[in-house]
């Protein structure tokens, strides 16, 4: 155990670096990080288990930072752990720097998650804790007995998602989850008591958490709380640390600058910065240094970790020798190796809803993927993720032998939990709900895309054909919104998301195949509620992997190209019959993913939709869904308003999604 004097000096060292980093960057958030320095110091110098030589070691503890604006605190402690250089700390918030304003996932550097909008980071931790429990149930505590730590701020507690994360973690009895709440009672614009007076401890206790309240700047209290939390066998633990915003900060006149909103989101500045560095024992002329005794303490910890890891790896080797099948699973699951699926042998019921086809595939995945977890936001029997559930069983408190998570009515929480599972590694995560409720998931979808995580988002009830439920439940603009992610490039230069809306049950099988093969970005799968006619006999469904392909009229002698995605394709097929009777020749193109189509060679794109061709597009969403493909030489029939409450076949007639209207629109266009 390190002395209190040394631990306090280490925390002050982190505070000095924090203030200096923000000052040099001329922007940032020093106050919260200065207050949280004591906890992060105790955690990394005495508790967090990781492998100094192999940051990807699957048995490591994981730390999830929720308030990403407190990044200087994390970068500083990771620099003490040899993950960053001092020069890199000096480049906080600069172009090309590995120290961006909010941390971005980088396992090699010890960054377990990208910290985005408040509330998401600690929910990732819940997902990681679930993944760890799931894997422990299959592989054993010898290799999966690690701890998930999270750090949350006042803002994260206020975000609505904390309700879902707190409820789920408590219900499932995630005793491998320890969360520190940095309760400094200050936020960017106000004190917390100007917007809330709830009893946070009682709230988490009501959710089933163990709650420990301490002085969050007292290293002895932090150590004792972490020790108690580690010993907890039944519940997740929340450590409420009452901390001092801007601890150690001084104003230009030398008076205390602590507990002040002014330290939250701006450099301390001028004489306030100088006085603060002096007060903390730093050198104003050279603040970017490690105190020798502090660096020695962290070096000693790294050596301790090498011994701990060596012991655990020896135990793992003995476990592997005794459990070769489990050892192979561990290797396969964390390397991303997947089982062989005979996709061509999957039989689908003809002319069925594509959500039903998805259920068929999910059942096969449940039987063949030992490391897949599926979830639904209280809609499994409607979004048909119950195809997976029927082959396994749901998690229950303390029991993770199943592979299905009933997330409850909490779409954003569910999405972030799945992100946390993906970040943990070793598992494949999928989650489902109605497409219209993807609106609740957009912040998480964006973060999954930014982090390049292969979460599978399953959305059923894809269009106005939800029918009687009315416009509140009928997607209109949602497809356009989600498909925008196909147009945004991630930092690897690829489309940040794959979005697939299959035209029939067989395309749905191929869509799932593409989703499972896609291990570099999230995938959105959009399925119908209603029956959809099969595409014409002879359709080469494997061409789904090109994003768009010809399903009828492939010869060059045509008058117009008809294109659509999803159930509108079958409407085009019926419309083409009327056009044919009138002597108009058509080519029909199914476009499950424009983003995927745009990545194909130009020659292929031109062969499917030649420049200058007359093109008619049909979409149950906004016309913009197809305008990029149709171009100025064509026309798109789509929705211009919200939907209506009526049987879906009535809506087809009223809104113009019929063969007759396809005929009329094409005739008028030609």
Feature map (PLM): residue ranges:
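Conserved acidic/glycine
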Residues: 1-34, 152, 156, 160, ...
């Amino acid at each position: 155990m390190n002395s209190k004097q040394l631990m306090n000096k280490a925390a002050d060292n982190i505070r000095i670096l924090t203030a200096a980093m923000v000052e040099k960057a001329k922007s940032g958030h020093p106050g919260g990080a200065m207050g949280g320095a004591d906890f992060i110091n105790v955690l990394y110098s005495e508790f967090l288990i990781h492998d100094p030589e192999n940051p990807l070691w699957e048995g490591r503890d994981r730390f999830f930072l929720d308030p990403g604006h407190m990044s200087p605190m994390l970068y500083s402690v990771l620099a003490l752990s040899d993950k960053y250089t001092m020069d890199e700390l000096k480049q906080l918030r600069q172009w090309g720097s590995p120290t961006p304003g909010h941390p971005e996932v980088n396992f090699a550097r010890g960054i377990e998650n990208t910290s985005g909008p408040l509330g998401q980071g600690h929910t990732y931790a819940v997902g990681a804790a679930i993944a760890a429990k799931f894997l422990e149930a299959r592989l054993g505590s010898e290799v999966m007995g690690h701890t998930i730590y999270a750090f949350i701020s006042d803002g994260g507690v206020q975000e609505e998602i904390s309700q879902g994360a707190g409820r789920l973690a408590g219900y499932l009895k995630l005793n491998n989850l320890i969360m520190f709440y940095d309760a400094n009672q200050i936020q960017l614009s106000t004190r917390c008591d100007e917007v809330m007076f709830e009893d946070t401890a009682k709230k988490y206790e009501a959710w089933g958490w163990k709650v420990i309240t301490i002085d969050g700047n007292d290293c002895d209290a932090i150590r004792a709380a972490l020790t108690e939390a580690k010993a907890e066998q039944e519940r997740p633990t929340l450590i409420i640390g009452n901390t001092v915003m801007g601890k150690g900060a001084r104003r230009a006149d030398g008076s205390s600058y602590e507990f002040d909103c002014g330290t939250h989101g701006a450099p301390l500045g001028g004489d306030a910065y100088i006085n603060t560095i002096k007060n903390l024992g730093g050198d104003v002329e050279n603040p970017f240094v490690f105190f020798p005794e502090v660096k020695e303490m962290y070096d000693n910890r790294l050596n301790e970790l090498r011994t701990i890891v060596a012991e655990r790896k020896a135990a793992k080797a003995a476990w592997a020798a005794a459990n070769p099948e489990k050892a192979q699973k561990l290797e396969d699951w964390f390397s991303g190796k997947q089982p062989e699926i005979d996709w061509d042998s999957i039989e689908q019921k003809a002319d069925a809803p594509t959500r039903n086809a998805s259920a068929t595939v999910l059942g096969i995945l449940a039987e063949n993927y030992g490391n897949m977890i599926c979830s639904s936001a209280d809609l499994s029997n409607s979004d048909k993720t119950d195809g997976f559930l029927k082959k396994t069983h749901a998690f229950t408190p303390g029991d993770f032998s199943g592979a299905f998570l009933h997330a409850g009515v909490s779409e954003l929480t569910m999405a972030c939990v799945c992100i946390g599972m993906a970040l943990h590694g070793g598992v494949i995560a999928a989650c489902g709900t109605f497409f219209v409720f993807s609106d609740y998931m957009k912040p998480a979808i964006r973060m999954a895309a930014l982090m390049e995580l292969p979460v599978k988002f399953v959305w059923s009830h894809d269009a106005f054909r939800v029918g009687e439920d009315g416009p509140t439940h009928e997607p209109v603009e949602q497809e356009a919104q989600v498909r925008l992610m196909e147009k945004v490039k991630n930092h690897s230069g690829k489309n940040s998301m794959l979005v697939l809306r299959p035209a029939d049950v067989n395309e749905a099988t191929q869509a799932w195949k593409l989703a499972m093969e896609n291990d570099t970005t999230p995938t959105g799968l959009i399925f119908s509620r209603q029956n959809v006619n099969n595409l014409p006999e002879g359709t080469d469904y494997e061409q789904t992997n090109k994003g768009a392909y010809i399903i009828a009229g492939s010869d060059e002698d045509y008058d117009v190209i008809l294109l659509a995605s999803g159930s509108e394709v079958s409407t085009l097929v019926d419309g083409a019959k009327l056009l044919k009777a009138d002597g108009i020749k058509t080519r029909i193109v199914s476009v499950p993913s424009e983003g995927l189509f745009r990545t194909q060679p130009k020659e292929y794109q031109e062969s499917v939709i030649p420049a200058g061709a007359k093109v008619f597009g049909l979409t149950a969403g906004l016309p913009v869904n197809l305008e990029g493909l149709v171009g100025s030489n064509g026309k798109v029939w789509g929705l211009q308003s919200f939907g209506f409450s009526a049987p879906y076949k009535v809506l087809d007639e009223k809104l113009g999604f019929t063969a007759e209207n396809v005929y009329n629109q094409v005739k008028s266009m030609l």
